[in-house]
Amino acid sequence: MSLFEHGVKNLHTLVKDGEVKVSELVQESFDRIDRVDGKIGAFLSLNEDAFEQAKRMDEIAKHEANPLFGLPIGVKDNIVTKGMTTTCGSKFLENFVPAHDATVVERLHEAGAITIGKLNMDEFAMGSSNENSAYKPVRNPWNTKHVPGGSSGGSAAAVAAGEVLFSLGSDTGGSIRQPAAYCGVVGLKPTYGLVSRYGLVAFASSLDQIGPLTRTVEDNAYLLSAIAGHCDMDSTSANVNPTDYTQALTGDIKGLKIAVPKEYFGEGISEGVKENIRAAIKKLESLGATVDEVSLPNSKYALATYYLLASSEASSNLARFDGIRYGVRAEADALEDVFKYSRAQGFGDEVKRRIMLGTYALSSGYYDAYYKKAQQARTLIKHDFDQVLANYDVIIGPTAPTPAFELGAQNDDPVTMYANDILTIPINLAGVPAISVPAGLVDGLPVGLQIIGKHFDEATIYRAAHAFELATGGFALPKL
């Protein structure tokens, strides 16, 4: 039996009572990575100091009250870590070693968690399959011929494969929730502004959020409790007080009002996914929740809106990678050629595609027709969510339209690839929180149930997700 099967709460008791050493947990993580990561490809680098750090922590473990003390965590490689490479899955930052930790990493270290290593991802978080990493693709632990989802594919796969107890990912249009669904783990995108973005390498600043991926809802709540809260270093950080989200895990959802958008069961959603989500809805009803069908009519504009806005923000954010200050630097005689050749050599095809799309949308002749119109559509999408959530506690539906697809199956069709995020993108545009929890299998591959909540009401999302998890069994470890 893996020590990680105990979860945060039980592991804390075992460590505090001296029945399990922190060094044993770290060693188990490294041993598991050594055994299975050759098949999965979840890690890009490992923390060479982790074991020595764990041995020092063994000596003080019995005095520590924080539930995360001594527990191993993986960090997505677009979240900066002091003294460890942060590549963003790109050759451009192959040798970049930050001088400071991101706020979320700092808070986890203060809580006693140990960073085991940095996790693979789509380059600069641009992708839905984790095939866009400049180093290696990540494979789904449930079936290594299939993708794990993206862009936080390494974060989801590492948890699903039992390499770490939990991980951090980032979510711009579904990049935590979609991989969580594909890999059968729990993944939360918090309300925009709840978790500091300081130290997250920006893709689309008005959409990006850091969040936790875990085996269970309870572990997820522990992790969010540690990283949420105001940060002076992030101008978009909300003025919210720290919260213990585990207090919401009552197992009782009697009277919970649930909305189910009819648009989330339309064309493009596989029958297997629909069947599993309808079964999940019936389960929630049997637990005492009330369910009504609603409409989010402007969701049909979400995909186009997102790719215009996110690409526009990316073209601006990635302008900083110029071959001068850090990262790849091409040899050239003229300064303009240094910029041009450095970016040509350092960026992959998908990143170049989105930079070009964003630059086009922001150009003077097309700004009103594309970028401005997309901002107007975003307002309509947000209004839809505000209206529904004024009358309901949560909105539920599938996380992804299909289970994980095979590696290489959509590489030549960017539009089909983009459509994999059609059910997660609206949530980022609205800025509301959402979680994906395991909700069955289709042909041996996991399906995710997405639970969407009101701004800064992660507690109700956790309450609903936890009750569903208790009733259905939740996480299962795939056979590797």
Swiss-Prot record:
Q: How does it assemble?
A: Heterotrimer of A, B and C subunits.
Which GO BP terms sit in this record? translation
Originating gene: gatA
Example of a GO MF term:
glutaminyl-tRNA synthase (glutamine-hydrolyzing) activity
Q: Which NCBIfam families match?
A: gatA
Natural source organism? Exiguobacterium sibiricum (strain DSM 17290 / CCUG 55495 / CIP 109462 / JCM 13490 / 255-15)
Please give the name of this protein: Glutamyl-tRNA(Gln) amidotransferase subunit A
Superkingdom as given in the UniProt entry:
Bacteria
For this protein, what is the EC number?
6.3.5.7
